[in-house]
Structures are given as C-alpha cells and as structure tokens.
C-alpha cells in the first residue's frame, strides 16, 4: 500500500524526473527515514541520479547529538553523502525575538538551500504526509488563517513531498514491516504545542464524526489551492501596476475586494519583505474605504502603511520629531535637517508683483528695517495660530494644515518662518496675510525653499 501510494504520488504530481539530484531533509525521525528508504528502493526505477541527506542539529533536546549520530550512521549504511550542521536554535530565537518553531524552520531551509546551491541539487524532498496535511489545515482553520487553510501542495517549485498520499498509521506500519529503524522525538507525544494537541486530541474526535476525514480534506485542499492560485495570479497583475511605490485608490477600488486585499498584501510584501497579518489587512481595508484625512497602520517595527487622502504609501518609521528652531537673517541660508531642505533669505529689489504669486516655493514680505530683522524657522507649537493670505481672522494652525490637506504624519516636520510672534509662512504651502507687498519699488525680504 505505501509503496503503491508513493509511486502514485510521484507520477500523479510529477515529483521526480529522470536524472534528478535529490536532497532529503533528514531528521532521523520515522517520516524522513521511510521517505529515504523508498527513494533508495525505487532509485533505479525512477532514474534518480543522486540522493543526498541534510540534517540540522537544533540543539533543542539532550538527545540531539544522538539524533545526529544516527543520521550519520544511516547515511553510511546506505552509502549516501550527508551534510550536517549544529546550531543553538533557542539562543538564536531569543536573540531575534522569534518563536523556536519559526527560527528552526528558517535555519533548516537556509541550510538546505546552501547545500543545494553548492552541490547543484535540483530537488528538496521532505517527509510531509497526508496526516500532516490534515493537521496543518485544521491548525490554520483554528487560527483563522486564510492562506494556510488550504494546506500544502505535493510540489511547490523545487520542494517535493512524495509521502503526500500516505497517512501516519500507514508509515508506521510500513516501518514495522520492513524493520526500518528511526529516532523517536518524545515531544511528538506531548500536548503542550497546538499541532500535537490537534494530532492527539482533536483529530480522533473529528474522525468519530467523519472517518474519511483525510480524504475529505485532501479533496478540499486541492480545490482551495486551485481557487487560491487563480486569485493570486489575478491580484499579482493588479499589484504590478503599482511598482512606482504608491497606490491610487481610484485605480485599485474598481476591482473586487477579493482581489484588492490580495493585491495590497503582495504590494506590501514586495516593498517591505513583511507579509501583513489578517488583522492588519482588515484595518487596511477599513481605512481605504474612507478617503478623508490621513491614517496610518504599523506594519512592522520598520514600516508604516499610510493613507493620505486617496493615496496609499509605505514609509519607514520615522523617529518622533522633537521641537526644532533655527535663526536666519537676510543673506543667510540654513539647512533644516528635520525637513531635509534648505531655506534661504535675501533682499529683493527688482521684482514685479506677478512674479510673487508662487507662495509654495518662494514668498516675499514688505517689512520696514528688514536689514536688521531676525527671523526664526521652527516647527509648530501648541497654540500656534495663523492668518492665511486673503483673510483677516486668525485660525488654529492645525485647522489651516487640515484645510491645506497636509498629512498628519508630516505636520511636525514642516518649517514655519516666524517674525516675532507672527507666523509668516507655512513653508512650501501657504503665506500669511502679514506684511503684504502693496507697492512696487520697495525693498522686500524673501524666503525661498531649495530641496536637497
């Protein structure tokens, strides 16, 4: 039965081709040992060129070194080349603030990839089987993970799972019949970890309701994978449209929500290497439906997703801007590091009123005794008020910035040019009503932005 299902999976899913060089992820446990035994037995039949073993010693159990010796002896017995590496997973996980399971997986696959690259190996075979598939689907269902609930496929790029159609009981019976020795990991019989609780407590109860649980979930996995593949391909086409670094919501929201959230996931992953959680995706979907103001969501310690009105951006997390202040006199030029720009001040005598209309990059004021005047460039302070040009009444600076649609996450950085207690200019946005230019021929004090 096991051998028949092994060969069926190899053929049905095109797992092995003539001349393949296969690296087995070899723990010494029953699954990887039976897998290796089957590969050796059918090596000639499947025309496999080479079989190699790779064992990562996680240093998690007192028996870890004995596990490694077993793997080395097994390789020697069957004339296979084995690659081993020893790492302290617990210390690495603590240092990087990751779970032991996550860090162990990262180290294993990094090790496997290195071996494959160095030895020109084109297939990585793992011992995942049908019972693993069932456990995985139930585990992700319990955790509400859409991407994981479909389980794993028998073949994903160069990773193959030849035991895909074989369950755990069948593997154990086969090992017993063939006298195959293997290492036993006692943690597999503990119930502290979610997967083991599913294996030993939950699945037996479900099988009491549906004895064909494995077959049912195998079929479900197949159809969920088909749906997922199609939606991923379509959403990838959408995310490709936003390679310039931002998303215009008018262009995105013409698509169905099933594609929108996937496109956003792909876009975020491509930009940051971070795969957003479902809680984050739900928050993102909520804020993109509202186009007023600015909203942000922390994706990771390094990145924020920001919606500024109808546009989505991804930006690195900025340190909180502290109050800053610079002094500037006519004829001087200063660098405002907090805004990453220069502001220069100078006296203007040759001008026309028409040329003074661009208040975003340059503003001029008609101030008496300007040669001795000293101005301050600073960011906003609590209680700041401002009189926009063309108005007579003061407004709260915060309200003016909202009217100008200045994103909330940028307001602390924007330079203000101040004279005495009067804010003359919201640099790059709006001049005040103070000291308007009313007569030609008068000397003017001007301020101009220069970007780095």
From Swiss-Prot:
The keyword Nucleotide-binding applies. It catalyses: cytidine(34) in tRNA(Ile2) + L-lysine + ATP = lysidine(34) in tRNA(Ile2) + AMP + diphosphate + H(+). CDD domains: TilS_N. Its EC number is 6.3.4.19. One of its GO terms (biological process) is tRNA modification. One of its GO terms (cellular component) is cytoplasm. Keywords: ATP-binding, Cytoplasm, Ligase, Nucleotide-binding, tRNA processing. It is found in: Cytoplasm. SMART domains: TilS_C (SM00977). InterPro entries: Lysidine-tRNA-synth_C, Rossmann-like_a/b/a_fold, TilS/TtcA_N, tRNA_Ile_lys_synt, tRNA_Ile_lys_synt_N. The keyword Nucleotide-binding applies. The N-terminal region contains the highly conserved SGGXDS motif, predicted to be a P-loop motif involved in ATP binding. Belongs to the tRNA(Ile)-lysidine synthase family. PANTHER family: TRNA(ILE)-LYSIDINE SYNTHASE-RELATED. This is tRNA(Ile)-lysidine synthase. It comes from Persephonella marina (strain DSM 14350 / EX-H1). The gene is tilS.
């Amino acid at each position: 039965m096991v051998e028949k299902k092994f060969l069926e999976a190899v053929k049905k899913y095109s797992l092995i081709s003539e001349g393949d060089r296969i690296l087995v992820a070899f723990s010494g446990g029953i699954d990887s040992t039976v897998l290796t035994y089957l590969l050796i037995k059918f090596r000639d039949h499947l025309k496999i060129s080479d079989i190699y073993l790779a064992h990562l010693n996680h240093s998690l159990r007192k028996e870890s070194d004995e596990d490694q010796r077993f793997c080395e002896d097994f390789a020697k017995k069957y004339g296979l080349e084995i690659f081993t590496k020893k790492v302290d997973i617990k210390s690495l996980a603590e240092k990087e603030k990751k779970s032991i399971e996550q860090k162990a997986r990262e180290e294993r696959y990094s090790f496997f990839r290195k071996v494959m690259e160095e030895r020109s190996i084109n297939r990585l075979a793992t011992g995942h089987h049908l019972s693993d598939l069932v456990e995985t689907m139930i585990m992700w269902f319990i955790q509400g993970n859409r991407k994981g609930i479909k389980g794993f496929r028998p073949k994903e790029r160069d990773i193959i799972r030849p035991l895909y159609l074989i369950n755990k009981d069948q593997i154990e019976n086969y090992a017993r019949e063939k006298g195959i020795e293997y290492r036993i990991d006692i943690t597999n019989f503990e119930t502290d970890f979610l997967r083991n609780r599913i294996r030993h407590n939950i699945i037996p109860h479900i099988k009491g309701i549906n004895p064909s649980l494995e077959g049912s979930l195998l079929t479900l996995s197949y159809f969920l994978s088909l749906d997922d593949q199609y939606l991923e391909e379509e959403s990838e086409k959408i995310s490709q449209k936003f390679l310039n670094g931002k998303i215009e919501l008018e262009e995105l929201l013409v698509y169905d929500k099933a594609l929108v959230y996937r496109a956003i996931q792909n876009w975020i992953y491509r930009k940051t290497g971070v795969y957003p959680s479902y809680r984050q995706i739900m928050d993102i979907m909520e804020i993109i439906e509202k186009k007023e103001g600015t909203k942000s969501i922390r994706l990771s310690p390094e990145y924020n997703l920001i919606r500024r009105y109808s546009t989505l951006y991804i930006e690195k997390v900025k340190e909180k801007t502290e109050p800053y202040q610079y002094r500037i006199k006519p004829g001087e030029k200063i660098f405002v590091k907090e805004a990453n720009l220069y502001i220069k001040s100078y006296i203007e005598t040759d001008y026309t009123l028409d040329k003074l209309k661009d208040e975003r990059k340059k503003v001029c004021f008609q101030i008496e005794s300007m040669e001795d005047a000293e101005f301050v460039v600073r960011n906003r302070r609590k209680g700041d008020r401002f009189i926009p040009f063309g108005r007579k009444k003061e407004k709260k600076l915060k309200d003016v910035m909202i009217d100008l649609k200045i994103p909330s996450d940028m307001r602390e950085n924007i330079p203000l040019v101040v004279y005495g207690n009067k804010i003359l200019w919201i640099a790059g946005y709006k001049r005040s009503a103070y000291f308007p230019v009313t007569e030609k021929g008068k000397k003017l004090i001007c301020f101009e932005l220069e970007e780095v």
